[in-house]
Each structure stands twice: as structure tokens, then as C-alpha cells.
């Protein structure tokens, strides 16, 4: 009912996130991450009854076939166009090709699915004044993370403390491996460089 009312009031459609990259301010996953098919089907049926609007889905495609089959069922049930975010993943660089092929096949079967490609890669800001940095899962960092930035800098300049950051084992954190991919971490620069060359990475410079 909420979706139907929203579209009648002028909304373009219904968008849902199925990616771990979207979180609440507190860092928790969005409730839509593991939404059941029954819930999504109810929404697709509501959109179908209105006969207007789009569906948008942002997915990690961790189980590509299962996910694509689900999305095709949703698109078919809604009878409306669906847009799916398509991007290249570091761990599976060819997955986007498979996704586009699956979209083409689904459309041959009668669906109306469009791959939506980002104009540039999605990045994540890392720093000592924000929530993510390469040492966030290290015990040494957790000792100072609640201090003011000025106080943190004092510790970061201390050689003994820096050694701890570089040598202590990292604890558990969902983003731990991602924020330590040194060959894919780059200084932002001033002005910002959004398409950095490989030789400007932290790994290359070190």
C-alpha cells in the first residue's frame, strides 16, 4: 500500500538495496538486505496494479544465478521496467559481463530489465577523522579512536605507537580486508583525482 500510494503521489517507482555497502548511520545493514521474496513479490504486484513506475534493485550478486532468477521473477510480476546497478567488482572482474548477458536473456523472455552503469567507480573515504581507516580493526587504534583528532595525531607521530599499528594483528571487522587493499588505496589529492593511475597507489609508493 505504501508503494502504491507513493507512486500515485508522484514517485518514480520503488528502489531496494540488497548490498552490504549500504548501511545506517550506526553502521548496521539496511533492513532490505535480506528481504524475503514474498515481501518483494507483494511490492511487485502493487506496482503491477498501478501500471506505472519503475523497480530499481542494487545487489552484490553474491549468488548470481539465484539473484538474477529472483529479479527476473520480480520484473515479470510487476510488468514494469526494472533497472539493476551493474559495476565491476575487484574480486570478480568479469561478473558484470555475466550480469549483462543474464539481463539480455531475461529480456528475450519478456522482461524489461536495464543495466544501470555508474559514471565512475564508487569509492570510500578513509581517514583518521572519519569512521573508516586501514587500522580500524587494530587494538592500538581502538585505544585512541575516541580521542580528539589533535590527541590522535600525537599518538600517530609516536614511533612506538606506529610500530604497534603496523605489526599488531587486526581484529574482526567486516570492512577490514577492503580498507587494507593497499594497491587499491590512493591519496585523494587536491583537487581530487577520481581516476588515479596504479603507480599512485599506497602500495606502489611504499
Regions inferred by a protein language model and the residue ranges of each:
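Active-site neighborhoods of metal-dependent hydrolases
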Residues: 1-46, 57-206
